[in-house]
């Protein structure tokens, strides 16, 4: 029996989502379009298999084939990131980070991470997160120019003496200097933990410096710029840390791994290892630079005055409208983005004075410089007259026509 016959409600809603993804423009920096081959194996019989433990050391029988699958995922991950050890079992980036903390430090120890309001992530010590409740957290941020001042980070680290320093961000448009972070970590005797969830796809293509050999441990999601399934990974070059990480993930915070997702990670890694991937990642950065240049030419303020990666962060501190207003206006025109706090923020986190835009998903559809210039100018048109609903409606129709030339999926399920 087909899904349409068995559960028409879910079938219809899934197809409405297909329509939304195909007709609109996805510009949330953390979202992307994965391969049909990835989704195909995620919907396979591998979802039936329990496999607590690790390859060759399972608590259940019948794991000979899933052992081979997980081993393949591990080997591809190691090759991709040029590291010695990899754990591919984390169900998400947040659980990967939780596993890193559990492996490296003890509850109550101090961690130093980027402030959430400056572009960090919840799991880097934010008080509302378990990372900010189980561990004592302190923060560094960006200056008013939107960039990390590494001397300021050094001063904070020397004062706070953390056991672990987290480098990585969810809304930082510039290159992260992992070597400088390692210098600082060594000076205070801390572990350096790099969370590259947002930039991993650029890193493996040589479009952003690698955290190796500087970081003791590296985590990432497998979606975002990697375009794989939703999930997490942890990597290191230290055998003893690898053992601690494995124990922290299982049996520490997870039980049976999601073997259908681990297989999908392996498929994604195969794509990431291809020459085609390097072309894609380069275009992601090129498209982001086109976006940044058009917006600046149209007199909009960007945090750090540009971008080195896949995203731009707009600041509306000099405007009458908020990030929430901008988010809504773009949404009415068929562009999905997200409001975001900015350095010098004057509004609440639920309103904000910024907007984060990313190019990974549009690039996955085949958008290049020509299309990005069109889209970027439409964004500027909308934000120049943010309350003009008629304009938003007209632009939505124009963008729908543009999107129809770049269909990413022909069907909702694979």
UniProtKB/Swiss-Prot annotation:
GO cellular component: cytosol
Organism: Campylobacter jejuni (strain RM1221)
Protein name: Serine hydroxymethyltransferase
Catalytic reaction annotation: (6R)-5,10-methylene-5,6,7,8-tetrahydrofolate + glycine + H2O = (6S)-5,6,7,8-tetrahydrofolate + L-serine
UniProt KW keywords: Amino-acid biosynthesis, Cytoplasm, One-carbon metabolism, Pyridoxal phosphate, Transferase
Pathway the protein acts in: One-carbon metabolism; tetrahydrofolate interconversion; Amino-acid biosynthesis; glycine biosynthesis; glycine from L-serine: step 1/1
UniProt record similarity statement: Belongs to the SHMT family.
Any one GO molecular function term: glycine hydroxymethyltransferase activity
């Amino acid at each position: 029996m087909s899904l349409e016959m068995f559960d028409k409600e879910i079938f219809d809603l899934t197809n409405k989502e297909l329509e939304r993804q195909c007709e609109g423009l996805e510009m949330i920096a953390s979202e992307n379009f994965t391969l049909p081959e990835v989704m195909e194996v995620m919907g396979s019989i591998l979802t039936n298999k329990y496999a607590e433990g690790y390859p060759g050391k399972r608590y259940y029988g019948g794991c000979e084939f899933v052992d081979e699958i997980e081993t393949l995922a591990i080997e591809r991950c190691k090759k991709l990131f040029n590291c010695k050890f990899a754990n591919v079992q984390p169900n998400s980036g947040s659980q990967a980070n939780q596993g890193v903390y559990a492996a490296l430090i003890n509850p109550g120890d101090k961690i130093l991470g980027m402030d959430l309001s400056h572009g960090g992530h919840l799991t880097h010590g934010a008080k509302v997160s378990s990372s900010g409740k189980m561990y004592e957290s302190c923060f560094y941020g960006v200056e008013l120019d939107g960039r990390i001042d590494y001397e300021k980070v050094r001063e904070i680290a020397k004062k706070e003496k953390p056991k672990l320093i987290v480098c990585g961000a969810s809304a930082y448009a510039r290159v992260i200097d992992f070597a400088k972070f390692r210098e600082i970590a060594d000076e205070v005797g801390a572990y350096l933990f790099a969370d590259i969830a947002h930039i991993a796809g650029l890193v493996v293509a040589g479009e952003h410096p690698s955290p190796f050999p500087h970081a003791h441990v590296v985590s990432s999601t497998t979606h975002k710029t990697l375009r794989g399934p939703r999930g997490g990974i942890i990597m290191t070059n230290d055998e003893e840390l690898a053992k601690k990480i494995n124990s922290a993930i299982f049996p520490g915070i997870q039980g049976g791994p999601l073997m259908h997702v681990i297989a999908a990670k392996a498929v994604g890694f195969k794509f990431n290892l291809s020459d085609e991937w390097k072309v894609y990642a380069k275009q992601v950065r090129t498209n982001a630079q086109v976006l940044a240049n058009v917006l600046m030419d149209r007199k909009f303020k960007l945090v750090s005055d540009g971008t080195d990666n896949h995203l731009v962060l707009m600041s509306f501190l000099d405007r009458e409208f908020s990030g929430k207003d901008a988010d809504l206006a773009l949404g009415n025109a068929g562009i999905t983005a997200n409001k975001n706090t900015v350095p010098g923020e004057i509004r609440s986190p639920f309103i904000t004075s910024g907007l984060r835009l990313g190019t990974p998903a549009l690039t996955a559809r085949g958008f290049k410089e020509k299309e990005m210039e069109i889209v970027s100018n439409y964004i500027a048109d909308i934000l120049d007259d943010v309350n003009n609903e008629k304009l938003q409606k007209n632009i939505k129709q124009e963008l729908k026509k543009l999107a129809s030339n770049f269909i990413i999926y022909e069907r909702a399920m694979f």
